[in-house]
């Protein structure tokens, strides 16, 4: 007892007791805050998913089925992931304006919050590609324009043309222009393969290489005539027309000159 009393009268006893008391209170508050925050986040997530389900039932289920299992006119959405929904809905391709051969890009029908809710709901159906975060899309820091140009020419140019302006495909389909497309949507298209586009998994094209492709596309946007003279921008036939007119004109001119010389 005397030893305990002596410790209590020590000069450092009061500061030490105060320190441990504050430490205990702080630790208790941190644990309680973390628990409350986790519960709040979980509740918010549940609300978002339910909102997405209601949007799906009203705007998507007539084509994709009540359980997103798909139908004769629309594919299943099970396993497509949040990235696919964010791309299709965020670019206005879905819902489709009409049942044409290909979904065209247009102004989105749903706002950002509704799109996020719809993506969150579809993501709960089965695992699939997630929406890339801002830290994953820093193409200016992590991408290489030179590497991106080479990758684009090897993997993308045969459909989107070497300047990313788009081009015709078979059966009335087309590869859209990549000019003016958000980096997030370019990335999502590569990992989900919308419509006729193949899926470029991380094993085929790594995340860093995807950022390089995006960086090259963004650099191409700044160059108005990436392929040289625009020839009036009336379509690819202008090059062939110019070749035929100049070529035939020169041949006719040479023929006339030779005929006159023979006389």
What is each stretch, according to the model?
Residues 2, 97-166, 172, 183, ...:
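Flexible coil segments in periplasmic/lumen-exposed cytochrome c-class electron-transfer proteins
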Residues 2-39:
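Hydrophobic secretory-pathway targeting helix
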Residues 5-13, 46-49, 145-146, 235:
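Juxtamembrane/transmembrane-helix boundary motifs in multi-pass membrane proteins
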Residues 30-54, 71, 126-151, 171:
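Electrostatic cytochrome c docking/interface patches
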Residues 48-53, 65-108, 149, 161-203:
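Gly/Gly-Pro-rich "capping" loops immediately C-terminal to redox-active cysteine motifs
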């Amino acid at each position: 007892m005397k030893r305990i009393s002596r410790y209590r009268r020590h000069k450092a006893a009061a500061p030490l007791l105060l320190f441990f008391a504050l430490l205990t209170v702080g630790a208790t508050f941190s644990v309680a805050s973390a628990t409350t925050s986790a519960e709040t986040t979980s509740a918010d997530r549940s609300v978002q998913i339910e909102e997405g389900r209601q949007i799906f039932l009203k705007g998507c289920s007539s084509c994709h089925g009540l359980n997103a299992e798909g139908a004769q006119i629309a594919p299943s959405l099970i396993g497509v992931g949040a990235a696919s929904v964010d791309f299709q809905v965020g670019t206005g391709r879905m819902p489709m304006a009409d049942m044409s051969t290909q979904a065209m890009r247009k102004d989105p029908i749903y706002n950002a919050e509704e799109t996020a809710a719809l993506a969150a709901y579809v993501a709960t159906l089965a695992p699939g590609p997630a929406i890339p975060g801002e830290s994953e899309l820093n193409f200016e820091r992590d991408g290489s324009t030179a590497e991106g140009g080479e990758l684009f020419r090897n993997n993308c140019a045969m459909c989107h043309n070497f300047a990313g302006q788009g081009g015709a495909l078979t059966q009335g389909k087309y590869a859209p222009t990549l000019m003016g497309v958000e980096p997030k949507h370019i990335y999502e298209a590569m990992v989900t393969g919308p419509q006729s586009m193949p899926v470029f998994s991380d094993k085929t094209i790594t995340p860093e290489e995807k950022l390089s492709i995006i960086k090259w596309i963004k650099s191409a946007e700044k160059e108005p005539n990436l392929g040289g003279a625009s020839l009036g921008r009336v379509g690819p036939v202008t090059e062939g027309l110019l070749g035929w007119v100049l070529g035939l004109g020169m041949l006719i001119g040479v023929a006339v000159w030779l005929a006159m010389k023979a006389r």
